[in-house]
Amino acid sequence: ALGACFGLLVAFATRVCVQRFAWAKNLHRELRPLTRGLTGTGIVALALTSSLGEELLFRGLLQPWLGLWLQALLFGVLHQLAGSSRWVWASWATLVGFALGAIFALTGSLAGPLAAHALINGLNLSYLKSHDTEPPAGLGGLLGSRG
């Protein structure tokens, strides 16, 4: 239940950030082409397989060996992208990796982090595919838009 709640919270926070902040809109625009050609079944398959592989590697294998902080940092670094929003994506992935690792540390099970990760990936891939964003207006969006 903890993992599912965290996954839903992160997916909701992603939507709020994309609607409100220029940096999140830019990241959304840079990632959106990756969903081109994905079907609903493809999104589910990608969300499940990537989550399973990453949780087995980062939380199951690396966290017991490297610890919570280092596995989270490595998780973020390995999510590095090309493009102007790469630092945002890597930072976000580091924070999420830390939280997933904390769930694993608290519960001693990969079930929670896996549920969270699959929900985050599935819901965010669906959102990326189905929602376009308008270009941000100037630098003011860095601190949020006013409407």
Language model feature labels by segment:
Residues 1-11:
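Alpha-helical transmembrane segments
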Residues 15-31:
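Membrane-helix interface/capping segments
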Residues 23, 33-147:
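Transmembrane helix-loop-helix hairpins at the membrane interface
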Residues 10-13, 17, 79:
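Hydrophobic membrane-targeting signal helices
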